[in-house]
A protein has these predicted regions:
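Charged, alpha-helix-enriched surfaces in structured cytosolic catalytic cores
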Residues: 65, 83, 102-103
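Catalytic NTP-binding/metal-coordinating core of nucleotidyl cyclase/transferase enzymes
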Residues: 1-69, 76
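A short glycine-enriched loop-to-beta-strand structural element that forms part of the catalytic core
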Residues: 82-96
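A residue-level structural signature of the nucleotidyltransferase/glycosyltransferase Rossmann-like core
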Residues: 7, 85, 99-100
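Catalytic-core segments of nucleotide cyclases and related cyclic-nucleotide turnover enzymes
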Residues: 96-105
Length: 105
């Protein structure tokens, strides 16, 4: 299928009610969140392949990069009102058109 890869997925917890309550505030929080995640991805050697809604899909060549990225995001958002869920998955996947596919995903 493809080489073994590591994937990090993120999602902001409770974002829909926040959008309903205050769109301007949520837009600012989301922009901050996106900067934090993208900075952590760059530092950890990952590749963003998905940004649906308020979450990210990021590919890494090894689990060390994915864990480092997740910890970097957590550390940067410690004082932030947003709670971000993150999951890491490892398995075979193939890359096509700047995205990944296969049973792992």
């Amino acid at each position: 299928m493809g080489p073994l890869r590591c994937f990090l997925f993120t999602d902001i917890e409770g974002s829909s009610p926040r959008w309903d309550a205050d769109q301007d505030e949520m837009a600012g929080l989301l922009a901050h969140h996106d900067r934090v995640v993208r900075d952590a991805v760059v530092r950890s050697g990952g590749k963003v392949f998905s940004t649906g809604g308020d979450g990210f899909g990021v590919a890494f060549d090894d689990v060390t990069g994915a864990i480092g990225c997740a910890l970097g995001v957590q550390d940067a958002l410690t004082q932030d009102p947003l709670r971000v869920r993150m999951g890491i998955h490892v398995g075979e996947a193939s890359e096509r058109d700047n995205s990944f596919f296969g049973p792992t995903l």
